[in-house]
A protein has these predicted regions:
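Extended, low-polarity segments enriched in aliphatic/aromatic residues
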Residues: 3-213
């Protein structure tokens, strides 16, 4: 996910443009709208943010622009299904390109957080993850419960794509703040490390954590 307007730490769009033009000419970037009100809350706002941040070199599919669909969650503690952007079901493969960083509630933002939050649609799915019974405050959920819910959302997507999904974490400009904080993100103090790639999401995120700590 690309973060808010002019976010200082996101993956440079020129890197992704070169990758797409060289190796993924038929690819589209996929996004969903946010649950909180910001630069990506509505599809119109989101497309303007994409333009400001330079993501205009290939098609961008805002997955929940045309509605939602449900993916099953197998063996879930919190969910039996997860609401994702409707258009996600139109794809037969997924490259999960993630800017690895910190996250106030999730501990860190890697491939798991990118998919779990990033594929859930902006109104229903993200609400299922962020809110608890009896509260409309998205921040009242405990960190442990939020992380479990994110993981279950992620599992629904990973199970859907099966062998046709791969994970790439970019360990660069790693603030303790999520990219959703945009220009308000805390200053970067961690050295740039490199890029981690795997077809195993747990391996990708664990290797990233190990390299940072």
């Amino acid at each position: 996910r690309q973060g808010e307007k002019n976010g200082p730490n996101i993956i440079p769009h020129t890197w992704v443009k070169e990758l797409v033009e060289k190796d993924l000419s038929d690819a589209a970037i996929v996004e969903t709208n946010t649950y909180y009100e910001g630069d990506r809350y509505t599809t119109e706002q989101h497309r303007e943010t994409l333009k400001v941040n330079g993501w205009t070199f290939c098609p961008v599919d805002i997955l929940d622009e045309n509605g939602t669909t449900m993916f099953p969650v197998k063996g879930g503690k919190w969910f039996t299904e997860m609401s994702v952007g409707k258009d996600l079901a139109d794809y037969d493969s997924l490259v999960v390109l993630t800017h690895f960083k910190g996250h106030t509630m999730g501990g860190f933002g890697g491939s798991n957080k990118n998919i779990g939050i990033g594929c859930a649609d902006g109104r229903i799915g993200k609400g299922m993850i962020h809110t608890v019974e009896g509260s409309d405050n998205m921040w009242s959920i405990s960190m442990e419960e939020l992380m479990e819910r994110i993981a279950e959302s992620t599992k629904s997507v990973v199970d859907h794509f099966g062998e046709h999904i791969t994970f790439v974490n970019v360990l660069r400009n790693m603030s303790v703040s999520c990219d959703c904080e945009g220009c308000a993100a805390a200053p970067v103090v961690t050295p740039n490390i490199g890029i981690v790639a795997s077809r195993d999401i747990l391996a990708a995120d664990q290797a990233s954590v190990d390299l940072v700590y």
